[in-house]
């Protein structure tokens, strides 16, 4: 599949500068060649831009002035333009309408005529599935679930009973939506399991990565709000709420009843204790332990930066003696204060 730059601009906007070439592929800036188009995210890639052999480049207005003889698409945000162009070149696969003979569908289900239910998918009783959905092989949907339009459940996704999935949601392979939350009460010498009676609600335009788990609520629902993006291997515990358009990177753990606001970003391997709240537009660095509520938007981090093993071991030794250091500093402060007083006292 190939497109002229003129066609691309008509579809996606932007401004065409230079010759109207035809391109068939997207490629990284430093590797792009004939028939390929690349984007320049910012001026820090100026050298790679000037050396690039790409047939066309997506650039800002400021950078376009440095490339008077090249084929360009000028855009306010080249990275966003690249994302939309990638979708033009690689549109989502349309469902093949129908229910495969080897799929299992329970009683009382309502499934949109344009949706695809693949081989070995299992759908419980009284499930509602909208139009243009794709349920791939090995998907399991429990009783009473509601699934909107244009939803894709990749192979071996499990949706437990009574969960609600909005429109244009994607859940990737191996993820489990609606498993029991970790609710236990201590009874003398053993744990007593607390029934988890809430649901999981994934609102419109949510995407869940591979092997991620979202636990159902104990009494109220666990809710992932509109447009939130969750990466692979993320654990979201019961009663958690993730705000609209928040993005969470891989290997994050969020303990129960925590609420993360809208339009936040969370770096990989960050951990959240339970029963805290995080303000809208908060940005958490990778590896951070969030141990208390964050009431003001901003950038937060608590992980040590990378250093050599030798330096780390040396610093670790000092950390072990921080209490001794603190006592010595206090003693020095007392001695300094005594010395000051002695100098201030009149001498006979």
Curated annotation (Swiss-Prot):
Q: Which GO terms describe its cellular component?
A: membrane
Main EC class the enzyme belongs to: transferase
EC assignment: 2.3.1.191
Q: Which GO terms describe its molecular function?
A: N-acyltransferase activity
An example GO biological process term is: lipid A biosynthetic process
> Taxonomically, which superkingdom?
Bacteria
Q: Which reaction does it catalyse?
A: a UDP-3-O-[(3R)-3-hydroxyacyl]-alpha-D-glucosamine + a (3R)-hydroxyacyl-[ACP] = a UDP-2-N,3-O-bis[(3R)-3-hydroxyacyl]-alpha-D-glucosamine + holo-[ACP] + H(+)
Q: Return the Pfam families for the record.
A: Hexapep (PF00132), LpxD (PF04613)
InterPro entries assigned to the protein according to its UniProt record, in alphabetical order: Hexapep, LpxD, Trimer_LpxA-like_sf, UDP_GlcNAc_AcTrfase_non-rep
What does the record give as its pathway?
Bacterial outer membrane biogenesis; LPS lipid A biosynthesis
**Keywords annotated in UniProt:** Acyltransferase, Lipid A biosynthesis, Lipid biosynthesis, Lipid metabolism, Repeat, Transferase
- Which sites are catalytic? 238 (proton acceptor)
Quaternary structure and partners = Homotrimer.
Summarizing the function annotation, the protein's role is: Catalyzes the N-acylation of UDP-3-O-acylglucosamine using 3-hydroxyacyl-ACP as the acyl donor. Is involved in the biosynthesis of lipid A, a phosphorylated glycolipid that anchors the lipopolysaccharide to the outer membrane of the cell.
The similarity annotation says: Belongs to the transferase hexapeptide repeat family. LpxD subfamily.
What is this protein's record name?
UDP-3-O-acylglucosamine N-acyltransferase
